[in-house]
């Protein structure tokens, strides 16, 4: 039986090397341990199976921080049928914040998740000077070994539906904690539900208290960075 992490990498041969590495999330350890429930939810679930193309999903994006100015933006996922296959084009943020993500010719998992993680990893590199491969490894290990999966009700377009929340703290037990001391308690939360279009309701990375933002008269030593991406609409409306 093919391990899921290797399987995901094989399904997207045209997505680009960086995206394939992120999708694999540890294919090198595929024979060492089974796929965890968190990995199954995030990377082995066909989030787009219930969507009818063409369709466009829109997500809001909000960043709050005391390190640098926050901002609000949006993420758009455009789906189309090409030669009987579902293709996906992801526009992850706009302007100076735009993250380039390769188009997928045969999409199964929701690429918004990949865009969010690639964005976060790039930000960690920018803020700390660390290696993107190291941050990917920490996230991979946390999903494989230390993720918490809980039931969580959510409200989408006025309706309460059941969801599952996956939470990880990749740097809490980091052997290189001395270098990334300020980021030890950074928490990632992924909220998924089969009852919302695209399967992903909300993605969040949080460090510190998001209500504490930078001001000219109130400097804060400990970094506070909160980034939240939330599904707001799909067009045309899905059955």
Q: Each predicted region: which residue ranges?
A:
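N-terminal secretory signal peptides that target proteins for export/translocation
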Residues: 1-11
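Sec/Tat signal peptide C-region and signal peptidase I cleavage site
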Residues: 28-32
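Acidic, serine/threonine-rich low-complexity disordered tracts
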Residues: 33-104, 130-239
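Extracellular/luminal beta-rich ligand-recognition
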Residues: 119-129, 133
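Surface-exposed, glycine/proline- and aromatic-rich loop segments on solvent-exposed faces
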Residues: 90-92, 98-123
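Bacterial N-terminal signal peptides
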Residues: 15-26
């Amino acid at each position: 039986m093919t391990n899921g992490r290797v399987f995901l990498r094989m399904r997207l041969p045209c997505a680009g090397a960086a995206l394939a590495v992120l999708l694999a999330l540890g294919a090198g350890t595929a024979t060492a341990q089974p796929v965890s429930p968190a990995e199954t939810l995030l990377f082995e679930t066909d989030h787009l199976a219930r969507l009818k193309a063409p369709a466009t999903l829109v997500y809001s994006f909000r960043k709050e921080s005391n390190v640098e100015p926050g901002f609000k933006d949006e993420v758009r996922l455009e789906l189309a049928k090409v030669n009987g296959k579902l293709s996906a084009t992801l526009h992850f943020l706009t302007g100076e914040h735009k993250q380039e993500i390769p188009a997928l010719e045969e999409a199964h998992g929701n690429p918004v998740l990949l865009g969010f993680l690639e964005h976060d990893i790039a930000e960690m590199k920018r803020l700390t000077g660390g290696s993107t491969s190291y941050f990917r490894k920490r996230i991979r290990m946390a999903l494989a070994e230390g993720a918490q999966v809980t039931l969580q009700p959510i409200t989408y377009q006025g309706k309460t539906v059941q969801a599952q929340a996956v939470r990880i703290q990749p740097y809490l037990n980091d052997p290189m904690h001395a270098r990334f001391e300020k980021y030890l308690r950074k928490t990632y939360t992924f909220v998924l539900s089969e009852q919302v279009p695209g399967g992903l309701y909300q993605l969040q990375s949080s460090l510190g208290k998001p209500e504490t933002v930078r001001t000219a008269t109130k400097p804060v030593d400990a970094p506070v960075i909160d980034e939240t991406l939330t599904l707001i609409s799909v067009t045309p409306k899905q059955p």
